[in-house]
Amino acid sequence: MDDYTQSINDAVKCLRQGGVIAYPTEAVYGLGCDPFNHDAVAQLLTIKKRSIKKGFILIASEWKQVEPLTEPIDPKALARVFDTWPGPFTWTFPASKEAPHWITGQHSTIAIRVTAHPLAKLLCQRFAGPLISSSANQEGGPPIRDVKILRLVFGNKIDKILEGPLGPTHRPTPIRDAITGEILRL
């Protein structure tokens, strides 16, 4: 990870200044920003041509970064979630009052993944908090796995690209309900 130290530091600086970045994840390039910066989230919505009603996934390097954004759930259900993390699995939790409405959208839940991707995890660690993780595509388009295509599609609309290898998964992560285990997206 030493090869990426400067790039990660630059990405963190960009995030703290309210920028929108692209970064590698378990499956595809993700677009993200500080989830607590409303202006940055508004910019991301514009870039993706996405409705605020849909909500966003948050990634974190560890559970404690996102736990305050969730309401407590049954310990057995939480154990089932923890069995899949860190890893390419996104779970929806009942959202707490701490979860910004521009992250949850029209939902009463918040979607969270504790990432196993080394660069995404390090990015969250250095940022000291969760990040929005939305597939690098415009609404309805295919997710991007190639940095050259990422540059062609988004050009100067994003503030920083953190280049790096993608994870071994070739599709966006599945989403499941943390309480019921129901699959919401495969």
UniProtKB/Swiss-Prot annotation:
Q: Does the keyword Ribosomal protein apply?
A: no
Q: Name one GO biological process term.
A: regulation of translational fidelity
Query: Which positions fall inside the YrdC-like domain?
Result: 5-186
Provide any one GO MF term from the record. tRNA binding
| Top-level EC class as recorded in UniProt | transferase
**Where is coiled-coil annotated?**
none
Cell compartments where the protein resides: Cytoplasm
Q: Which InterPro entries match?
A: DHBP_synth_RibB-like_a/b_dom, Sua5-like_dom, TC-AMP_synthase, TC-AMP_synthase_SUA5
Question: Gene3D superfamilies from the xrefs?
Answer: DHBP synthase
Q: Which reaction does it catalyse?
A: L-threonine + hydrogencarbonate + ATP = L-threonylcarbamoyladenylate + diphosphate + H2O
Q: What Pfam families does the record tag this protein with?
A: Sua5_yciO_yrdC (PF01300)
Q: Which GO terms describe its cellular component?
A: cytoplasm
Nucleotidyltransferase as a keyword? yes
User: Which keywords annotate this record?
Assistant: ATP-binding, Cytoplasm, Nucleotide-binding, Nucleotidyltransferase, Transferase, tRNA processing
Q: What does this protein do?
A: Required for the formation of a threonylcarbamoyl group on adenosine at position 37 (t(6)A37) in tRNAs that read codons beginning with adenine. Catalyzes the conversion of L-threonine, HCO(3)(-)/CO(2) and ATP to give threonylcarbamoyl-AMP (TC-AMP) as the acyladenylate intermediate, with the release of diphosphate.
Q: Which family does it belong to?
A: Belongs to the SUA5 family. TsaC subfamily.
What is this protein called in UniProt?
Threonylcarbamoyl-AMP synthase
Q: Which organism is it from?
A: Coxiella burnetii (strain Dugway 5J108-111)
**Which taxonomic lineage does the organism of this UniProt entry have?**
Bacteria, Pseudomonadati, Pseudomonadota, Gammaproteobacteria, Legionellales
Name of the gene: tsaC
